[in-house]
Regions:
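Short, conserved SAM-binding/catalytic segment
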Residues: 48-60
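Conserved class I S-adenosyl-L-methionine
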Residues: 5-13
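P-loop NTPase Walker A phosphate-binding motif
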Residues: 26-27
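Signature of N6-adenine DNA methyltransferases within the class I
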Residues: 13-23, 32, 40-47, 70-224
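S-adenosyl-L-methionine
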Residues: 1-2
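Conserved SAM-binding strand-loop segment of SAM-dependent methyltransferases
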Residues: 59-70
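A generic structural motif
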Residues: 30-33, 61
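Conserved beta-strand positions in the Rossmann-like core of class I SAM-dependent methyltransferases
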Residues: 36
């Protein structure tokens, strides 16, 4: 990504753009950055537009606000980065819409929206980074999703515990992966806000088929 001077970023379920100041700061060295910001809630986009007007980012940053359902929207572009915080909820009250979502999904065992978001993001971006519930790494519901992620070049997992969002008592993690990678790395970085550690370990060790879930804290003591 360092060599590219023009990049395109997609943030699905952007809300009011909590991540945008960080992204603007991170990519201020680029000549041009185009953001496609999508949300199903038009009110959130109205608020976001007002925030961007006050923020006044440099002109090299372009913001396209799209009021649509990310999961059903037809994208023409492919993206250098897809980043965000997809919704964490199961769709149970709209069977017709759930059927539509599942028809495009690989993991049909889950009704959780964030699982569908992960799959579509992988199809659209070179790099994908999402904050999602920690249940992704250990729930049987996401076995297929984990297999899909493991098929990409997983670079890093961060464990925030309950520190991801103030006032929200749900354990979250984030992941960073690369989709268009000819050679996958053997190691992955695990950063923990719980233990205050950053370690690099073999993927085959943490994601071993001997266990039904990912053991991101696996160590010699565990193996005894």
């Amino acid at each position: 990504m360092k060599e590219k001077k023009r990049i395109r970023i997609l943030e699905p379920s952007v809300g009011i753009g909590n991540f945008l100041p960080l992204l603007i700061a991170k990519f201020e060295d680029k000549d041009e950055v185009i953001f496609d910001l999508i949300d199903i809630d038009n009110h959130s986009l109205i608020v976001l537009k007002a925030i961007l007007e006050k923020l006044k980012p440099p002109r090299k940053f372009t913001f396209n606000l799209i009021n649509a359902d990310f999961l059903t929207h037809n994208f023409v572009e492919k993206y250098d980065i897809v980043v965000g915080n997809p919704p964490y909820r199961k769709l149970t009250n709209n069977k017709k819409l759930l059927t539509r979502y599942k028809s495009a999904a690989i993991n049909k065992e889950s009704n959780n929206l964030f699982s569908f978001f992960i799959e579509k993001a992988i199809s659209l971006g070179r790099f994908v980074s999402f904050i999602v519930p920690k249940s992704l790494i250990n729930s049987p519901e996401f076995d297929i999703t984990r297999n899909l992620l493991n098929g990409q070049n997983l670079i890093k997992i961060c464990d925030y515990g309950e520190k991801g969002f103030k006032g929200v008592k749900i354990e979250t993690i984030s992941f960073l992966l690369e989709t268009a990678c000819k050679t996958k790395s053997e190691n992955i970085i695990i950063e923990s806000y719980i233990t205050g550690t950053v370690v690099e370990k073999k993927k085959e060790y943490l994601f071993s088929d001997k266990f039904p879930y990912w053991l991101i804290y696996r160590n010699e003591l565990f193996d005894q």
